[in-house]
């Protein structure tokens, strides 16, 4: 089907944009599904990676905008939101307004009311409803990318509640779900009252195989071929032909070790001097130096310990072909789109406190990355196994079906978190209405069991915590409404309220309080971390909680204290690399912990204000910047971080006025180029105080 045939549905101007993007003709499944896309009905599209699901959704959103509607495009990760936003901006050429909302959970982002297409995450979209963003009711089309993540232990419940809330808010709402894998597609379609389209067509054919004890067996339809080959040879023969290789390892350590090993191969084919500098721009610690050396030689590792900037450098360089091999942990498979000619899965196991096999759906996500449209004649996905797992790899993973998608909403923590918001948002004023709401969820569709007992227990718990009152009908208290808007677990809100109502806190006391909450990620206590126990005992009078060392909570408590001590070192301006070495974490881990702690510190401070406790008031900004209180005025200035601020402060430069007055001195301390940018920023701000 030629794209010109779409002009009647999306306008000739929109067709012009598609042609500018090099799209002259639709893929076969796109041509088959396009009628359903323009029907206006709810729709579920289950198609492999790169088969063109997103383009179909874009056409639906463009058509919606032409009709005067507004679309919300929901993705699972912030990084994906940024990627989609950049991709959708092409539609601005025909007058559409594209927006993105991924930040502060308390913000309503009212400026997005003028946008035609808004990209966001499911958590942010849910928080926009909780904070009563005025424009959210005007959304007429909801696109859910990766709707199979209803199955996610962590994110699935929020996605399910978001869809249920939005369908209740706007009875005429159109929902479009996109999925690469959906074994029980009819069940999800029934829940959404949707039509569905399923295709296994791929723009680049996929050949899958196993490498077992030096023998590679490839399965291409009904045919199979075999040959003797080593793992390293599989990598090199692909790189030699200018193909990209994506290797999946089960652990970070494995990913780093394999990337270092393979960099000796890729070094024969590339040299990346400039990229090395880009990797070391934000951090020059041990892991970053190892990554920079790999990248210089044309290989890279990719895992959650990398900084966001480093990940972007690696991803962009791999897409351009400057990096030939990326060795990643499985998290990459569900994240950004990085196709490669050959995907090699080094293990079907992952370690999660214990060793267990990955899901078939996880393998399918990894294998789905094989084959770059327009560049490769075919993609290859190869599993490396021992003799014991060969049959499982072939029967279950290569020829087997992904697991059925099941709702994860029935867990108490999810019920507690979402029941409070459902009451606060006015969807339920009685227990019966709360049950009615949950009867519209995917959980009820699948299980057809009442949650009345669990919901009553959750509501009584919220009553005991002072977040809900029941007097003829259910209503949120001031605390309950605040906790819902802050987007924290009600248990987190209760812990904050309980402690802050009765005691003032020191820095370490406040940081430990943050680390006590279920919303906070905690560091693992290693065998070599006996110093944590000693520090906990020394600081016991400053902590809001100190269990007996014989209690079952004691090990958990030590992990809370270790995380709090890590944050304390951060706000005391300890060197970033020293912190990472001391606590056994990577720079990306530290940034993630800091970001979560900043969000929770803000929530803690808001609750502290409600109970008249001022002891935690300056902490959020200190966590954000990683500084002592005396540097706050300097780090608020653009281009001045914790290291530059300390240099300036120690030299007697204390504020913006000092910087402008002593320009030459500032230039000698932080470099002339940076100093000029800082001064320019200060001048602009003084001319435009609101910028």
UniProtKB/Swiss-Prot annotation:
Region (Required for helicase but not ATPase activity): 400-691
EC number: 5.6.2.4
Entry annotated with the keyword DNA damage: yes
One function term, GO molecular function aspect: DNA binding
A Pfam cross-reference name: Helicase_C
An annotated GO BP: DNA repair
Catalytic activity: Couples ATP hydrolysis with the unwinding of duplex DNA by translocating in the 3'-5' direction; ATP + H2O = ADP + phosphate + H(+)
Start and end residues of each Helicase C-terminal domain: 230-421
Broad class of enzyme this protein falls into: isomerase
Motif DEAH box mapped to chain: 145-148
Keywords assigned by UniProt, alphabetized: ATP-binding, DNA damage, DNA repair, DNA-binding, Helicase, Hydrolase, Isomerase, Nucleotide-binding
Residue ranges of every copy of the Helicase ATP-binding domain listed in the record: 34-200
Annotated binding of ATP, by residue: 30, 47-54
UniProt comment concerning the protein's domains: The N-terminal region (1-400) has DNA-dependent ATPase activity but no helicase activity.
Subunit structure: Monomer.
Matches recorded under PANTHER family: ATP-DEPENDENT DNA HELICASE HEL308 (PTHR47961:SF10), DNA POLYMERASE THETA, PUTATIVE (AFU_ORTHOLOGUE AFUA_1G05260)-RELATED (PTHR47961)
Family: Belongs to the helicase family. Hel308 subfamily.
Function: DNA-dependent ATPase and 3'-5' DNA helicase that may be involved in repair of stalled replication forks.
Protein's UniProt name: ATP-dependent DNA helicase Hel308
Organism the protein comes from: Archaeoglobus fulgidus (strain ATCC 49558 / DSM 4304 / JCM 9628 / NBRC 100126 / VC-16)
Lineage: Archaea, Methanobacteriati, Methanobacteriota, Archaeoglobi, Archaeoglobales
Gene name of this polypeptide: hel308
């Amino acid at each position: 089907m030629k794209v010109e045939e779409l002009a009647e549905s999306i306008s000739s101007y929109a067709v012009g944009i598609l042609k500018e993007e090099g799209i002259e003709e639709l893929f076969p499944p796109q041509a088959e599904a396009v009628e359903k896309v323009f029907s206006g009905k709810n729709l579920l599209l289950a198609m492999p990676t790169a088969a063109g699901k997103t383009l179909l959704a874009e056409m639906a959103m463009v058509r919606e905008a032409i009709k005067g509607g507004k679309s919300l495009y929901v993705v699972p990760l912030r990084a994906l939101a940024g990627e989609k936003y950049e991709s959708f901006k092409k539609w601005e050429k025909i007058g559409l307004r594209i927006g993105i909302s991924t930040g502060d959970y308390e913000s309503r982002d009212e400026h997005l009311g003028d946008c035609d297409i808004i990209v966001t995450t499911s958590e942010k979209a849910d928080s926009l409803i909780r904070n009563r963003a005025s424009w959210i009711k005007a959304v007429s089309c909801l696109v859910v990318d990766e709707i199979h993540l209803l199955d996610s232990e962590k994110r699935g419940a929020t996605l399910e509640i978001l869809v249920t809330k939005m369908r209740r808010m706007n009875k005429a709402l159109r929902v479009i779900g996109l999925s690469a894998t959906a074994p029980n597609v009819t069940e999800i379609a029934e829940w959404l009252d949707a039509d569905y389209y399923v295709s296994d067509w791929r723009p680049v054919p996929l050949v899958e195989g196993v490498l077992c004890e030096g023998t590679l067996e490839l399965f291409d339809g009904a045919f199979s071929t075999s040959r003797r080959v080593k793992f390293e040879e599989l990598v090199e023969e692909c790189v030699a032909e200018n193909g990209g290789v994506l290797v999946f390892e089960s652990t970070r350590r494995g990913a780093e070790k394999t990337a270092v090993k393979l960099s000796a191969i890729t070094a024969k084919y590339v040299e990346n001097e400039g990229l090395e500098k880009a990797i070391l721009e934000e951090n020059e610690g041990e892991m970053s130096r190892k990554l920079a050396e790999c990248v210089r030689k044309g290989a890279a590792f990719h895992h959650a310990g990398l900084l966001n900037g480093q990940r972007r450098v690696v991803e962009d360089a791999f897409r351009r072909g400057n990096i030939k091999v990326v060795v990643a942990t499985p998290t990459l498979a569900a994240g950004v789109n990085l196709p490669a000619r050959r995907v090699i899965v080094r293990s079907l196991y992952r370690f999660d406190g214990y060793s267990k096999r990955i899901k078939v759906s996880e393998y399918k996500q990894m294998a789905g990355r094989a084959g770059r449209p327009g560049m490769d004649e075919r993609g290859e996905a190869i599993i490396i196994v021992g003799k014991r797992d060969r049959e499982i790899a072939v029967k279950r993973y290569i020829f087997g079906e992904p697991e059925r998608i099941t709702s994860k909403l029935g867990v108490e923590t999810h019920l507690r978190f979402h029941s409070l918001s459902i009451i606060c948002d006015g969807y339920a004023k009685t227990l019966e209405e709360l049950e009615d709401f949950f009867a519209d969820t995917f959980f009820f569709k699948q299980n057809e069991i009442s949650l009345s007992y669990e919901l009553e227990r959750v509501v009584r718990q919220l009553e005991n915590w002072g977040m809900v009152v029941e007097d003829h009908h259910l209503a949120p208290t001031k605390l309950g409404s605040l906790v819902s808007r802050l987007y924290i677990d009600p248990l987190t809100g209760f812990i904050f309220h309980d402690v802050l109502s009765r005691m003032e806190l020191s820095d370490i006391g406040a940081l430990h309080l943050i680390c006590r909450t279920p919303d906070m990620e905690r560091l693992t206590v290693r065998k070599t971390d006996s110093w944590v126990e000693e520090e906990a005992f020394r600081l016991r009078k400053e902590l809001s909680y100190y269990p007996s060392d014989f209690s079952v909570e004691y090990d958990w408590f030590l992990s809370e204290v270790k995380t709090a001590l890590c944050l304390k070192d951060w706000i005391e301006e300890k060197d970033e690399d020293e912190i990472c070495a001391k606590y056994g974490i990577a720079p990306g881990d530290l940034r993630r912990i800091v970001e979560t702690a900043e969000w929770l510190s803000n929530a803690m401070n808001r609750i502290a204000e409600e109970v008249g406790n001022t002891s935690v008031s300056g902490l959020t900004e200190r966590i954000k910047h990683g500084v002592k209180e005396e540097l706050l005025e300097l780090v608020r200035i653009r281009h001045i971080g914790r290291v530059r601020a300390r240099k300036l402060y120690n030299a007697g430069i204390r504020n913006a006025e000092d910087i402008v007055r002593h320009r030459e001195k500032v230039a000698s301390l932080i470099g002339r180029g940076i100093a000029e940018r800082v001064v320019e920023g200060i001048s602009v701000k003084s001319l435009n105080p609101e910028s």
